[in-house]
Protein backbone atom coordinates (compact mmCIF):
# COMPACT_ATOMS: atom_id res chain seq x y z
CA UNK A 1 0.00 0.00 0.00
CA UNK A 2 2.89 2.39 0.62
CA UNK A 3 5.44 0.89 -1.77
CA UNK A 4 6.81 2.51 -4.91
CA UNK A 5 4.82 2.41 -8.14
CA UNK A 6 6.02 1.91 -11.71
CA UNK A 7 4.36 3.91 -14.46
CA UNK A 8 4.85 2.69 -18.04
CA UNK A 9 5.52 5.27 -20.72
CA UNK A 10 2.31 6.09 -22.57
CA UNK A 11 0.13 5.86 -19.47
CA UNK A 12 -2.72 8.33 -19.03
CA UNK A 13 -2.70 10.31 -15.79
CA UNK A 14 -5.87 11.66 -14.19
CA UNK A 15 -5.37 14.45 -11.64
CA UNK A 16 -8.39 14.93 -9.40
CA UNK A 17 -8.58 17.72 -6.84
CA UNK A 18 -11.30 17.47 -4.23
CA UNK A 19 -11.84 20.67 -2.27
CA UNK A 20 -13.07 19.88 1.23
CA UNK A 21 -16.11 21.67 2.63
CA UNK A 22 -15.36 24.13 5.45
CA UNK A 23 -14.86 22.28 8.72
CA UNK A 24 -14.19 18.90 7.06
CA UNK A 25 -10.85 17.40 8.11
CA UNK A 26 -8.76 14.59 6.68
CA UNK A 27 -9.89 12.29 9.51
CA UNK A 28 -13.48 12.84 8.33
CA UNK A 29 -12.79 11.71 4.75
CA UNK A 30 -10.23 8.96 5.37
CA UNK A 31 -12.67 6.02 5.40
CA UNK A 32 -14.64 7.16 2.33
CA UNK A 33 -11.41 7.87 0.47
CA UNK A 34 -9.94 4.48 1.36
CA UNK A 35 -13.10 2.64 0.27
CA UNK A 36 -13.21 4.53 -3.03
CA UNK A 37 -9.53 3.81 -3.76
CA UNK A 38 -9.92 0.13 -2.86
CA UNK A 39 -12.83 -0.24 -5.28
CA UNK A 40 -10.71 1.20 -8.09
CA UNK A 41 -7.61 -0.85 -7.23
CA UNK A 42 -9.39 -4.17 -6.71
CA UNK A 43 -12.09 -3.90 -9.37
CA UNK A 44 -10.35 -2.18 -12.28
CA UNK A 45 -6.68 -3.11 -11.78
CA UNK A 46 -4.65 -4.35 -14.75
CA UNK A 47 -6.54 -6.46 -17.28
CA UNK A 48 -9.79 -6.06 -15.29
CA UNK A 49 -10.14 -2.42 -16.30
CA UNK A 50 -6.92 -0.63 -17.15
CA UNK A 51 -6.01 0.87 -13.76
CA UNK A 52 -2.19 0.92 -13.38
CA UNK A 53 -1.54 2.70 -10.09
CA UNK A 54 -2.60 5.62 -7.94
CA UNK A 55 -1.52 8.06 -5.27
CA UNK A 56 -3.40 10.27 -2.81
CA UNK A 57 -1.99 13.52 -1.48
CA UNK A 58 -3.22 15.89 1.23
CA UNK A 59 -2.48 19.58 0.64
CA UNK A 60 0.25 20.54 3.11
CA UNK A 61 -0.39 24.27 2.99
CA UNK A 62 2.87 24.92 1.15
CA UNK A 63 2.70 27.16 -1.92
CA UNK A 64 5.98 27.67 -3.77
CA UNK A 65 7.00 31.29 -4.29
CA UNK A 66 9.55 30.14 -6.86
CA UNK A 67 7.10 28.08 -8.89
CA UNK A 68 4.02 30.35 -8.69
CA UNK A 69 3.31 33.15 -11.14
CA UNK A 70 0.17 34.65 -9.59
CA UNK A 71 0.28 37.32 -6.89
CA UNK A 72 -2.16 35.49 -4.62
CA UNK A 73 -0.35 32.38 -3.42
CA UNK A 74 -2.87 30.52 -1.30
CA UNK A 75 -5.04 27.48 -1.78
CA UNK A 76 -7.99 25.94 0.04
CA UNK A 77 -7.76 22.62 1.87
CA UNK A 78 -7.94 19.86 -0.69
CA UNK A 79 -6.93 16.33 -1.57
CA UNK A 80 -5.24 15.36 -4.82
CA UNK A 81 -5.91 11.91 -6.24
CA UNK A 82 -3.50 10.92 -9.00
CA UNK A 83 -4.37 7.79 -10.97
CA UNK A 84 -2.65 6.16 -13.93
CA UNK A 85 -4.60 4.25 -16.59
CA UNK A 86 -3.97 2.49 -19.90
CA UNK A 87 -6.55 4.76 -21.56
CA UNK A 88 -8.96 7.58 -20.83
CA UNK A 89 -11.79 5.32 -22.05
CA UNK A 90 -11.01 2.67 -19.42
CA UNK A 91 -10.97 5.37 -16.75
CA UNK A 92 -14.36 6.66 -17.82
CA UNK A 93 -15.89 3.16 -17.93
CA UNK A 94 -14.69 2.47 -14.39
CA UNK A 95 -16.14 5.71 -13.08
CA UNK A 96 -19.50 5.09 -14.77
CA UNK A 97 -19.84 1.82 -12.82
CA UNK A 98 -22.51 1.85 -10.06
CA UNK A 99 -20.14 0.53 -7.36
CA UNK A 100 -17.62 3.31 -7.96
CA UNK A 101 -20.32 5.97 -8.26
CA UNK A 102 -21.70 5.03 -4.82
CA UNK A 103 -18.24 5.34 -3.22
CA UNK A 104 -17.54 8.61 -5.02
CA UNK A 105 -20.92 10.01 -3.90
CA UNK A 106 -20.00 9.30 -0.25
CA UNK A 107 -16.73 11.19 -0.76
CA UNK A 108 -18.45 14.04 -2.63
CA UNK A 109 -20.75 14.67 0.37
CA UNK A 110 -17.70 16.10 2.16
CA UNK A 111 -16.42 18.17 -0.76
CA UNK A 112 -17.43 21.55 -2.14
CA UNK A 113 -15.81 20.93 -5.53
CA UNK A 114 -14.07 18.25 -7.54
CA UNK A 115 -12.21 18.57 -10.82
CA UNK A 116 -10.53 15.68 -12.64
CA UNK A 117 -8.24 16.48 -15.55
CA UNK A 118 -6.55 13.98 -17.88
CA UNK A 119 -2.94 14.19 -19.02
CA UNK A 120 -0.72 12.38 -21.54
CA UNK A 121 2.71 11.37 -20.21
CA UNK A 122 5.45 13.27 -22.09
CA UNK A 123 8.52 12.59 -19.94
CA UNK A 124 9.61 10.71 -16.87
CA UNK A 125 12.99 10.09 -15.33
CA UNK A 126 15.07 9.39 -12.27
CA UNK A 127 18.55 10.56 -11.28
CA UNK A 128 21.20 8.67 -13.20
CA UNK A 129 23.92 6.69 -11.47
CA UNK A 130 27.56 7.40 -12.38
CA UNK A 131 28.38 5.63 -15.63
CA UNK A 132 24.73 5.13 -16.57
CA UNK A 133 23.63 6.31 -20.01
CA UNK A 134 20.48 8.44 -20.33
CA UNK A 135 17.34 6.46 -21.14
CA UNK A 136 15.85 6.94 -24.56
CA UNK A 137 12.18 7.65 -25.16
CA UNK A 138 10.52 4.46 -26.41
CA UNK A 139 9.52 4.46 -30.06
Question: At which residue positions do the language-model features occur?
Answer:
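Short S/T/G/P-rich N-terminal loop/turn motif that feeds into the first structured element of a domain
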Residues: 1-101, 110-139
Amino acid sequence: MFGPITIPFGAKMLFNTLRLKPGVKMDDVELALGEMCNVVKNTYGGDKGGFIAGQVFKFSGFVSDEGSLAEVRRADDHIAIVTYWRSFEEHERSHADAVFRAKFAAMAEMCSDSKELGYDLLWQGEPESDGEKPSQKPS
